[in-house]
Amino acid sequence: MLELIGRIDYRLGVGALIVALIIVIIVWTIAYIEYRKLVRQRRIDWLVKRIKERAEDSGNESGGDTEELETMVDMGHLRLLDGNDL
C-alpha cells in the first residue's frame, strides 16, 4: 500500500484538483443560469397576472405593465390578453 502511495506523483493530485475545480465551475454556472431563467419566468407570470387583474377590474389593460412585459420578453406586441376566457 505504501509503495502505491509512493509511486503516485503530486502532479496527479494537482491535476485531479484542477479537473474537479473546472467541473464545479461548470455546474454552478449552469445552476445560476437556470436560477435566472426561473426568476425571470416568475416575474413574467406575475406581470401577466397583474395585467389580467387590472383588465378585469377596469375593463381595459394597463399600458405600463404591458410595456414592461414586452421589454422583458423582447417582443413587439403581446397578445396575451386576447383570449376568449376574458
From Swiss-Prot:
Q: Which residues cross the membrane?
A: 13-33
Which ranges does the record list as Extracellular topological domains?
Answer: 1-12
Gene Ontology CC: host cell membrane; membrane
Keywords, comma-separated and alphabetical: AIDS, Apoptosis, Host membrane, Host-virus interaction, Inhibition of host innate immune response by virus, Inhibition of host tetherin by virus, Ion channel, Ion transport, Membrane, Phosphoprotein, Transmembrane, Transmembrane helix, Transport, Viral immunoevasion
Q: Give the Cytoplasmic membrane side ranges.
A: 34-86
Modification after translation, per record: Phosphorylated by host CK2. This phosphorylation is necessary for interaction with human BTRC and degradation of CD4.
Domain of life where this protein originates: Viruses
**Where are the annotated coiled coils located?**
none
Entry similarity comment: Belongs to the HIV-1 VPU protein family.
Q: How does it assemble?
A: Homopentamer. Interacts with host CD4 and BRTC; these interactions induce proteasomal degradation of CD4. Interacts with host BST2; this interaction leads to the degradation of host BST2. Interacts with host FBXW11. Interacts with host AP1M1; this interaction plays a role in the mistrafficking and subsequent degradation of host BST2. Interacts with host RANBP2; this interaction allows Vpu to down-regulate host BLM sumoylation.
Q: What else is known?
A: HIV-1 lineages are divided in three main groups, M (for Major), O (for Outlier), and N (for New, or Non-M, Non-O). The vast majority of strains found worldwide belong to the group M. Group O seems to be endemic to and largely confined to Cameroon and neighboring countries in West Central Africa, where these viruses represent a small minority of HIV-1 strains. The group N is represented by a limited number of isolates from Cameroonian persons. The group M is further subdivided in 9 clades or subtypes (A to D, F to H, J and K).
Reported function? Enhances virion budding, by targeting human CD4 and Tetherin/BST2 to proteasome degradation. Degradation of CD4 prevents any unwanted premature interactions between viral Env and its host receptor CD4 in the endoplasmic reticulum. Degradation of antiretroviral protein Tetherin/BST2 is important for virion budding, as BST2 tethers new viral particles to the host cell membrane. Mechanistically, Vpu bridges either CD4 or BST2 to BTRC, a substrate recognition subunit of the Skp1/Cullin/F-box protein E3 ubiquitin ligase, induces their ubiquitination and subsequent proteasomal degradation.
Q: Can you name this protein?
A: Protein Vpu
> From which lineage does this chain's organism come?
Viruses, Riboviria, Pararnavirae, Artverviricota, Revtraviricetes
